[in-house]
């Protein structure tokens, strides 16, 4: 089996905290130097590389003299602010040894949820690649709280792959790849060499939290691969402990787990809706509506809605789930949650009678709806 990276032109490489720090006690300058050398080699082979790197909080903890990761959000944000300075400095100096310039870009999900800012970020990244610069991306933890609590750079890597239409997302971790079960508990667990990104059985195989220094477990990597596949990007999950892993992957050696994007690439706007807009609420839809959305490519009408969950406004993104709670689709709603509760199970012809007005006959028009 040949590595999919060998034939990839544009890569997004995500390096986890454990691979750039000394067990969370500050940055490992030598390790970062090795990553810079490998990426320089990839650049020499004609590949474009965007690097998504963790490590800011771990470096901030070291600089502030903290031995344990803090629990308070404001302290995590302070550590990120202090540590990001060191992270950028080390990468700049190590890449300079190879004659490569770097750029620091800090992003939040809110940046990518705004269409104008999304397009601006895309334009900036593509320009940097054209200029021969290696963009180094991290989440802007200093201004966001939910990303520190629940976010991870695996997800960010997938979103960046979508953003720049990367060919392959490479997630480097301290594990060899995805196993059929937890190898620490099941001696019969075997490495999954290749699978389809988004295959339901992968989520059952994965699970568990990340390390005390990092944030992402294997499940986040599987979900990241599923997101990356929306724009046609394949994913490789491999151990960053492997010697010259990036160079060997680029040479065609199969290392770790390859997750292949087998579904059709989404249209740019629908991919943006699916991955970059925050879901504000849910509607439970009946079996008939599920069939019309998944098989018929139809709009979602109020008559197909059986329940409304959460509070949302007109123009926000909501998820459509079946009676088991499985998400089927998501899209931009034409009605608020309060309005939807009044018109659920009603034919579209009765909307004006119930509300006194009719904005649209559909709850979600098919042009604003994407299957997930």
From Swiss-Prot:
* GO annotation, cellular component aspect: cytosol
Q: Name one GO molecular function term.
A: glutamate 5-kinase activity
Per the record's keyword annotation, is Transmembrane helix included, yes or no?
no
Instruction: Spell out the reaction equation it catalyses.
Output: L-glutamate + ATP = L-glutamyl 5-phosphate + ADP
* Signal peptide residues on this chain, from the entry's feature table: none
Any idea which UniProt keywords this protein has? Amino-acid biosynthesis, ATP-binding, Cytoplasm, Kinase, Nucleotide-binding, Proline biosynthesis, Transferase
Domain named PUA: residues: 280-358
**Residues that bind ATP:** 14, 173-174
Q: What is its EC number?
A: 2.7.2.11
Which positions does UniProt annotate for substrate binding? 54, 141, 153
Q: Work out whether the entry's keyword set contains Kinase.
A: yes
Q: In which pathway does it act?
A: Amino-acid biosynthesis; L-proline biosynthesis; L-glutamate 5-semialdehyde from L-glutamate: step 1/2
GO biological process terms, alphabetically, are:
L-proline biosynthetic process
Instruction: Kindly list the cysteine pairs connected by disulfide bridges.
Output: none
Localization:
Cytoplasm
Function as written in the Swiss-Prot or TrEMBL entry: Catalyzes the transfer of a phosphate group to glutamate to form L-glutamate 5-phosphate.
Q: Which NCBIfam families match?
A: proB
Q: Which family does it belong to?
A: Belongs to the glutamate 5-kinase family.
Q: What is this protein called?
A: Glutamate 5-kinase
């Amino acid at each position: 089996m040949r590595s999919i990276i060998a034939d990839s032109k544009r890569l997004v490489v995500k390096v986890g905290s454990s691979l750039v720090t000394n067990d969370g006690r500050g940055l490992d300058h030598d390790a970062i130097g090795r990553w810079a050398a490998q990426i320089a080699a990839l650049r020499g082979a004609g590949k474009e590389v965007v690097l998504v790197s963790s490590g800011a909080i771990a470096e901030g903890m070291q600089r502030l003299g903290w031995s344990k990761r803090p629990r308070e959000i404001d302290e995590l944000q302070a550590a990120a602010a202090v540590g990001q300075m060191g992270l950028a400095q080390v990468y700049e100096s190590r890449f300079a040894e190879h004659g490569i310039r770097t750029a620091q870009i800090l992003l939040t999900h809110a940046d990518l949820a705004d269409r104008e800012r999304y397009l601006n970020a895309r334009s900036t990244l593509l320009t940097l690649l054209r200029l021969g610069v290696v963009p180094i991306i991290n989440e802007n933890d200093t201004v966001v709280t939910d990303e520190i609590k629940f976010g991870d750079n695996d997800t960010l890597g997938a979103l960046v792959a979508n953003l720049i239409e990367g060919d392959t997302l490479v997630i480097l971790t301290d594990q060899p790849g995805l196993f059929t079960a937890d190898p620490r508990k099941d001696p019969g667990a075997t490495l999954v060499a290749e699978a389809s990104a988004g295959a339901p059985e992968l989520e059952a195989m994965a699970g568990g939290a990340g390390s005390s220094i990092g944030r992402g477990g294997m499940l986040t990597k599987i979900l990241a691969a599923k997101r990356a596949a929306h724009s046609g990007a394949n994913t490789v999950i491999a151990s960053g402990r492997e010697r010259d892993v990036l160079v060997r992957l680029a040479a065609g050696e199969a290392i770790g787990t390859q997750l292949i994007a087998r579904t059709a690439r989404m249209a740019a706007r629908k991919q943006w809706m699916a991955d970059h807009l925050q879901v504000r609420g849910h509607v439970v839809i009946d079996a008939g509506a599920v069939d019309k959305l998944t098989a018929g490519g139809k709009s979602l009408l109020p008559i197909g809605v059986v329940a409304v969950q959460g509070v949302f406004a007109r123009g926000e993104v909501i998820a459509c789930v079946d009676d088991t709670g499985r998400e089927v689709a998501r899209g931009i709603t034409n009605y608020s949650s309060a309005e939807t509760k009044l018109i659920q199970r009603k034919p579209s012809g009765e909307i004006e009678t119930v509300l006194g007005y009719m904005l649209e006959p559909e709850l979600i028009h098919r042009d604003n709806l994407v299957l997930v």
